[in-house]
Amino acid sequence: MVQRWLYSTNAKDIAVLYFMIALFSGMAGTAMSMIIRLELAAPGSQYLAGNNQLFNVLVVGHAVLMIFFLVMPALIGGFGNYMLPLMIGASDMAFPRLNNVGFWLIVPALVCLVTSTLVEAGAGTGWTVYPPLSSIQAHSGPSVDLAIFALHLTSISSLLGSINFIVTTLNMRTNGMTMHKLPLFVWAIFITAFLLLLSLPVLSAGVTMLLLDRNFNTSFFEVAGGGDPILYQHLFWFFGHPEVYILIIPGFGIISHIVSTYSKKPVFGEISMVYAMASIGLLGFLVWSHHMYIVGLDADTRAYFTSATMIIAIPTGIKIFSWLATIYGGSIRLAVPMLYAIAFLFLFTIGGMTGVALANASLDVAFHDTYYVVGHFHYVLSMGAVFSTIAGYYYWSPQILGLYYNEKLAQIQFWLIFVGANVTFMPMHFLGINGMPRRIPDYPDAFAGWNYVASVGSFIAMISLVLFIYILYDQFVNGLTNKANNKSVLYTKSPDFVESNEIFNLNTIKTSSIEFLLTSPPAVHSFNTPAVQS
């Protein structure tokens, strides 16, 4: 056991470890969000006894757990490590031991994050950790320092993983697999790795300066010493905006594969899809100040960031319409992954539309720091990144495990989370338009109605996640029975347009699903092909 799981250098085992920590963190983050929603279900103080600091500690815990310990480990560490070598015909990742270190840095990071909530009054700064609220005057204990260490460790982990993904993709493709034949999920992880590589050092620099300000009397963000807290915001958001694309681009890759498989046809405009992802990634670095319209930027600066932000809608639209064109005229099977993919298309588009509204500097003056923003980013994260994670699990887990989930239960779980998430986050837009501020545990009575609706929706979504845990249990215990009883709607193992590993160099058809041509579950080393350079 110790040899296999503690010292593991096998990408598949490390991916399983990533999934385990993602599931654990996701449950913890969901629990925190439920406490937040219970507190906000009615005006006045409900459960936190007026402890507003604790409310903000829950907010920062929920955010950091969901972003750094659920979505990134699941989509990048889990699906990335497991599927990327299979899809390019590599026997493992390029640096297997680096992979192991990358995972085991996540665990102390999680410990640091949990500890930060337990010392003094916790880090009640919001996930952005803005000074002067995060300065030593406003947060005097070591809580913020521990949160900074957690960010440092996850950053190093992600950087090591990114280097690994880039080198693997460039150097370990099988014979005949040119970059143009790379499956879309591999492209997604590849582009994501570059985004991480370029954005994380900036975050690390920013929080390191904050650490020095707090403990070693420097004045990077201290006005009295000639510093400027706005510098921190620029550094943070130069990471923070690419980060949201880091969270969603692997989801784009998963959705492409699912839509293609269940429509029985290749993705419409595959090269365009790759260029769209690359454009989104590049433009993501040029728009960071749209998070800061109200800090006193010049009018021409605001005009630039408004225009640049709206340009990102173009490659995103290319992706949405290409997915729709893939579905159009296909032989559609509405199995669970396809339901999630179609829901993703609708809900991600809604999130994108509210994003276009927020891109306008003049409108954002009204919307900034209201629940409109919360509604917007939960549509793209909760119903974009998380939906694509669950979709990817339902799509690949029968192949990964050789065990099948109960299709009927999975469909019920889909409809529950679909209804629950919408009922939770749609009212937030209405609250935001009416001016309800974020990160405040109490509110005027006028906001009571929609807040109650949102809290009911969060309860529905939580029930669906409990059902998801039961579906996992059922899959591990009764997986073979489910397969035998046809309780699972099986996809065809290899759609007509998929070509096998041996004939890459003989044809020009771009394959997208070698992983389904392997044994189920795959062997410890699925391929023994030598690494070749194109």
Swiss-Prot record:
Binds 2 heme A groups non-covalently per subunit. Pathway: Energy metabolism; oxidative phosphorylation. GO terms for cellular component: mitochondrial inner membrane; respiratory chain complex IV. Its main location: mitochondrion. Its EC number is 7.1.1.9. Mg(2+) binds at residues 368-369. O2 binds at residue 245. Ca(2+) binds at residues 39, 42, 44, 441. Its cofactor is heme; Cu cation. PROSITE patterns: COX1, COX1_CUB. It catalyses: 4 Fe(II)-[cytochrome c] + O2 + 8 H(+)(in) = 4 Fe(III)-[cytochrome c] + 2 H2O + 4 H(+)(out). Keywords: Calcium, Copper, Electron transport, Heme, Iron, Magnesium, Membrane, Metal-binding, Mitochondrion, Mitochondrion inner membrane, Respiratory chain, Translocase, Transmembrane, Transmembrane helix, Transport. It is found in: Mitochondrion inner membrane. Disulfide bonds: none annotated. Component of the cytochrome c oxidase, the last enzyme in the mitochondrial electron transport chain which drives oxidative phosphorylation. The respiratory chain contains 3 multisubunit complexes succinate dehydrogenase (complex II, CII), ubiquinol-cytochrome c oxidoreductase (cytochrome b-c1 complex, complex III, CIII) and cytochrome c oxidase (complex IV, CIV), that cooperate to transfer electrons derived from NADH and succinate to molecular oxygen, creating an electrochemical gradient over the inner membrane that drives transmembrane transport and the ATP synthase. Component of the cytochrome c oxidase (complex IV, CIV), a multisubunit enzyme composed of a catalytic core of 3 subunits and several supernumerary subunits. The complex exists as a monomer or a dimer and forms supercomplexes (SCs) in the inner mitochondrial membrane with ubiquinol-cytochrome c oxidoreductase (cytochrome b-c1 complex, complex III, CIII). This is Cytochrome c oxidase subunit 1.
